[in-house]
Amino acid sequence: MQISEPVLFKGAPGSPYTRKMLAYLRFRHIRYELLIGDQTQHKNLPEPKVQLLPTFFLPDDDNKIQAVVDSTPLIRRFEADFEQRRSIPQDPVMAFLNYLIEDYADERLTKAMFHYRWYYQADIDMAGTILPRWTSIQSPEAELQQ
């Protein structure tokens, strides 16, 4: 089923995969609506089989909205559905290198990101202050401190 714009998805500001997909959508000039934290509560959206971010809400073959996760297959789907500014090279060798670098970045470079997010005390304190706000942006300060 062809995807219509704006593409609706749920993510978190500090999620590396949300950042990846935001960069991809912006590069491709694909209009989107990003839902953060509890903004999805009243939208009657399906739940993904696995709770991962970002979660895209896209039509299936029967035009029913499905919750879809995993950035690499999502990019392949968007490449097929949107014509403007393709990100995957046409040359097969370059396309393979593109996939290889993307896979390495997805699976390995996030380890460094999580290390620096949680290793040093100043970073632990900062993350502990910011992370609860990503999923509950409407919660009062006292509740977030618990």
Enumerate the language-model features and the residues they cover.
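GST-like domain detector, emphasizing the conserved glutathione-binding G-site
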Residues: 1-142
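Alpha-helix-centered segments that form part of catalytic cores
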Residues: 145-146
